[in-house]
Amino acid sequence: MHGSLLKLALLSFSLASSAAVLPRDTGRTSAPSGCSTVGTSGDYSTIGDALTALGSSTADACIYIAAGTYEEQLVINYAGHLTLYGETTDTQTYKQNTVTITHTISSPEAGSLDNSATVNIKSDLVSVYNINIANGYGSGAQAVALVANADQLGFYACQFTGYQDTLYAKAGHQYYINSRIEGAVDYIFGDASAWFENCDIVSNGAGYITAMSRETTSDTAWYAIDHCNIKAASGVDLTGDVYLGRPWRVLARVIYQYSVLPDIINAKGWHSMADGATPLYYEFNNTGAGSDTSDREYLSTIDAPVAKETVLGDDYKNWVDSSY
C-alpha cells in the first residue's frame, strides 16, 4: 500500500514538473484575457489607436497585436503597467515573430535621436513580447529603432533592426532576453542600466556594438552582455572590423560575460571616442575566435561576473518575467 502511494506521488510530481516546462515553447495566436486587440479583425486597426484608447488610466493594461507589418511611429507614455504582445507560434524565440513595427526616418531629418525612433517608450513598467521594431533608414545617418527611456522595461524575444544607433537604451533599468539586435555603428547606446541575456547581437557593417554614456562615478548604470552570441549578418564579411564598444561619455561601463565573440571582433576589442574618457570595459569567460584579450586596449580586469542585482537592482524579480 505504501509502495503504491509512493509511486503515485512520484508520478504526480513528474507530471506536474512536465506541465511546468511545457508552456516555454507554446504559441500566442490569440489575445490573452483582458487585452485589447490590433489587426484587420481587431478592436483597432493601428497600434497607435490602441495606445490612444488607454487614455489616462493607471490600471494594468495589455494590447495583443495580430500578425502583420505596421508602418507606424509610436510614443508610449502610459501611467500603468502596460504589456504589448505580438502574435507568435513560439513565445520563447524571436525567430517565429510575425509582428513588425517599422518606420523610416533619420535623426537629422527628425530633428533629434528620440524623434527618429520607430518606438519611443517614456513610461515605466512596459513589457514587450515577440515584436520586431525596425528603422529602415539604413546607412548614412543615425536612425533609431527603439528609444527605451524609462524604468523597469522588459523585452522578451523581440527584434531591433537598424544601422547606426539602433537601440537607444537611454535611462532606467532594462532587461532584454532571447532577442536580436542588429546594426553597425553604436547600435546599443545610452545610459540605461541594461542586461542582455541569450541575445543574438548582429553586426551588418563595420563599426562598434556599444556606445555607453555613463559620465559620473555616482551613476550605477551598466551594460551587461551575458550569454549572448555576437555575429555578422548573413552574407557580410566583417573579419576584424567590429569593436565591442567605444565610450559615448567618459565613464562608459560595459561587460561581456559568458558570450561568444567570433573573428569579426577586432583584436584591440575596444575603441576611443569621448575626449578624456576612462571607460570601464570588462570581459569575463567569453569564448570564440574573437575572445582572446591579449591585445586588448582600454580593458579593465574583473575577477567575477556581474550579477543581475548589480545591473537591474535588488528588486528585479518583481518586474522581470521569470518564465524566460
Swiss-Prot record:
Q: Write down the EC number.
A: 3.1.1.11
Q: What is this protein called?
A: Probable pectinesterase A
Question: Which BP terms from GO are recorded?
Answer: cell wall modification; pectin catabolic process
What top-level class of enzyme does the UniProt entry assign?
hydrolase
Where does this one sit in the cell?
Secreted
- Which cysteines link up through disulfide bonds? none
Q: Which residues bind substrate?
A: Q142, R246, W248
Q: Which Pfam families match?
A: Pectinesterase
Q: Glycosylated where? A: N285
As for what it does, the entry says: Involved in maceration and soft-rotting of plant tissue.
Site (Transition state stabilizer) found at: Q164
Matching Gene3D superfamilies: Single-stranded right-handed beta-helix, Pectin lyase-like
Keywords assigned: Aspartyl esterase, Cell wall biogenesis/degradation, Glycoprotein, Hydrolase, Secreted, Signal
The membrane-spanning stretches of this chain are: none
This protein's species is: Aspergillus flavus (strain ATCC 200026 / FGSC A1120 / IAM 13836 / NRRL 3357 / JCM 12722 / SRRC 167)
Signal sequence region: 1-19
Q: Which family does it belong to?
A: Belongs to the pectinesterase family.
Which Gene Ontology terms cover its molecular function?
A: pectinesterase activity
Q: Among its keywords, does the record have Transcription?
A: no
Pathway listed for it is: Glycan metabolism; pectin degradation; 2-dehydro-3-deoxy-D-gluconate from pectin: step 1/5
InterPro entries named in the record: Pectin_lyas_fold, Pectin_lyase_fold/virulence, Pectinesterase_Asp_AS, Pectinesterase_cat
Which residues constitute the catalytic centre? D165, D186
Q: So what does this thing catalyse?
A: [(1->4)-alpha-D-galacturonosyl methyl ester](n) + n H2O = [(1->4)-alpha-D-galacturonosyl](n) + n methanol + n H(+)
